[in-house]
Amino acid sequence: MRIPCLFKREAVSSSTAAWLAACLLLALLGGCGQQAEAPVTTQSSPANGWPRSIMTAKGEVVIERPPQRIVSTSVTLTGTLLTINAPIVASGATQGGTAITDEQGFFTQWSDVAKTRKLQPLYRGEPNAEAIIAANPDLIIVAGTGGDSALKLYEQLNLVAPTLVVNYDDKSWQELATLFGRATGHEADAAAAIQRFDSLAAATRASLVLPPQPTTALVYYEDDSGANVWTGASAQGKLLMDLGFTLAAVPDSVKGDKSMGIRKDIIQLSGEKFADGLQGQTLLLFSGNAQTAAQVKRNRFLAGSPAIKAGHVYPMGLDTFRLDYYSATQLLKHMQTLFRGNQAAASEQGKAETNPASRG
């Protein structure tokens, strides 16, 4: 196995090269042996901004030159690397062939991009150090949080290549793109993707007629036992607030023990106080579809929720569990359809109220 070297090489100056050539000629003629050696100079100034220092959850990481073979151990972070056209060659994956993944275990929102770029799946689920190392990476990306974290392999992987440990529970995909752009030299690609998305987000916000506020954004458990509520630190929460939504507060009295101090992006609700945590006048169901919305409405323990009583329960799509450029773009388009429809409905309702023929 070849371990890539990212250390700087010494550069020979033009004057030294000329001297060596002259010395070689004299040696052939038998007269260079007693000449004094000229000093060899090294290039000390960074070339085009390299090397670069990136501060991570594990401290400072120095990347000597632009990486050419990036390996992502986090399927959540892979989408953002694809977004900025980073040279990612392989990625960890998750269970394949589900409602949100393709047969390789990659998320459906960027599956086609992964296939076009011939991205290789390394493993599914449990991180595999041998598979990661065999991909011959010159930069390794590790999630510091979440179910796809390979943090336990950090010490081993960091011996192979510079390893960036990145927490995604408190960052939007834009923040991740900016970080990865600097680490890979793809700042321009990151900035362009963010600009495209921001333009779409601004147009979306201008077109929306918001449902009643505040809003509870959540991922509903399939067994009806609880939910994860997105906080303002989550990518989902940040996007909603950018669009003008107000996030409903979750009372401390109903937060689960695991919600305290471990993850910043979610609050876990379950048990008899589950319903008390759903304070929003509107429920947005992330990683949910129409069937999920119907299931939530059937849960008799949630019947007293103001959003359910008023019928303000909206599925956001199955691919919104992890927001990257691709899924967030699809979410914006979905919301344009969903809540622009409210505008049309309001218009029709206004016509009905002013049309005597429509009254019973």
Predicted ranges, named:
Residues 150-188, 294-315:
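Charged, glycine-enriched surface loops/patches
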Residues 69-81, 192-256:
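Basic- and aromatic-lined ligand-binding clefts that recognize polyanionic substrates
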Residues 129, 133-142, 162, 274, ...:
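Proline-aspartate-enriched helix->loop->beta-strand connector
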Residues 78-131, 144:
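A short, structured surface patch at a secondary-structure boundary
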